[in-house]
Amino acid sequence: MGALSDVIVLLGPELEPWRCARFEWEGDRLTRIERREPVLAIAAGARVVIPGLYNSHTHMGDSCLPDGATGLTLEEGFFRPHGFKYRMLAQLTREQHLPHVINHLRYMARTGTVGHLDFREQGPYGSELLREAALVTGVESVILGQFSGVPFDASALAANASRLPPAARAELEAILAVADGFSESTMNDLTDAAWGEIRELTERQGKLRAIHCLENAGYRDVSLGRTGRGDLVRALELYDPHLIVHLTVADPAEIALLAASGKTAALNPRANANLGLPVPPIRALMESGANLLLGTDNGLLNSPNMFAEMDYTYKLAKSQYGDAVRPDPLAILRMATCNIRGVLGPSHPGCLAEGLPATFVVLDFERPHLRSTRHIPASIVTRVTPEDVLATYRLGSPLYESEGFSARPS
C-alpha cells in the first residue's frame, strides 16, 4: 500500500484540481481519495498529483543520434533507404543500441511519462529491442513495428497494383508476433493492395495501426499524382488507422474528414518546427472536435519531455486563436493524459479516480517558480520542468522517485 497526505490531485477526466487529505493505492489500483475542497491557486506550495503522461508519437530507436540530422531536410534525415538515421542505425550492434533506448525510457519516467506509442523501425529486431528496454525500465512501450526495408521499388509503387512480396508478408507476420501493431512512414511507401493486406492481418490479430499523414505537402501531392486521392483519404479508406500522426498541412476539408472519421490524431509541433515545416493547425483541429494527442517524435530531433511539448503546444494554440484567453490549458493537458483512451481503450483511462489504475506523477509545487501559482493547470502546462518531478508511478509501482521522496502510509 502507498499513500500521500495533504496533496492537490487533478481528478477525473475533467482534471479538476482538488485539495485531498489522503491519496492511497494498493496493488495497481487507487483505493481512497479523500477530497477536501476544489482549488485553483495556492499561496504556500504543495505537492500536486496528476495522471501519468503518455507520449503518443515517438521514434526511440534513433534516440542514440541526438541532433544528428541538424542541417538536413526531412527527406535527407529520415526517409528510407538512404536517410541519415537509417544509415546510422544499420551500423549499430544490439549491445551499442540497447543502452541508448533504455536511458531514454528512463528519462521519460524522470519527466513524468508512463507510456509511449513508438514507430519502431528495423523490422522484428527493432520491436524486440524496444520490448527489452521497456521490460528493463517499466515504461509502457506500445510498439508499432515497421518494415526493415522498402518492399517495393519505384516502378511498382507507380503501378500501384502489387500485393506484398512473400518476404515482406513474412516480415509483417514476424513483426506482429512481437509488436502491438504496425506503422509506416507514409501511405506512399506501399501499394493500395499492400495496405489492404496489412489491414486485414492486423484486424484479424487485434493489432493497432498507425501512419504519418500530411507532414508536408509532398505526402498529399505524391499520393494524388499516383492514385488520384490524398494520403489522408487513402489512409482512412484503405488502412483504417487507430492513430494518425502530424496533419501539419491539413486543410479545412481534411480536418473535417478527420473529425468525421472519429480517428485520433497525434500532433508533434516541436518536431515540425525543428524540421522547418509548418506548425500544425492546432486551433482548427481543436475546434473540429477530433480527439488529439501529443508526441515528441524522433529522439534524434527532441528529448522525450512532454512538459516541453505541452508548453510549446499551448503557446502555439494561443497564438493561432489570436487572444490570451483560449484554449483552456486543461485541453492541452488532456492531450497528454485522458485523451489516450481514444487509442488504447478503457484500460488506459488517463485520469485519476478511486478504482482506476494507480498511474500518476507527483510534482513539487514547493519550488520557487511554482509555490504561489494562481492557476495550477496553467503552471503544470507551462512551468513544470523535469527537476520538479518528485515521482512517477505506473500501476502502483515507481518508475522514478527523487531522493527523499516517500509514499509510505502514515
Per-region residue spans from a language model:
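Mid-domain alpha/beta scaffold segments of enzyme catalytic cores
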Residues: Y107, G115-A179, E184-S185, D192-E197, ...
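Divalent metal-coordination and catalytic microenvironments
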Residues: V7, F23, D28, A46, ...
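C-terminal cap of metal-dependent C-N hydrolases
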Residues: P357-S410
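His/Asp/Glu-enriched, well-ordered alpha-helical/loop segment
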Residues: G230-D240, R283-R367
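Active-site core of metal-dependent hydrolases
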Residues: P166, L176-L300
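Alpha-helical scaffold segments that flank or form the walls of functional sites
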Residues: V48-V49, P66-G138, A167-A177
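Active-site gating loops and adjacent loop-to-helix segments of metal-dependent hydrolytic enzymes
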Residues: C64-P99, G138, F152-N160, K207, ...
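N-terminal metal-binding scaffold of metallo-dependent hydrolase/deaminase domains
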Residues: M1-P38, V48, S397
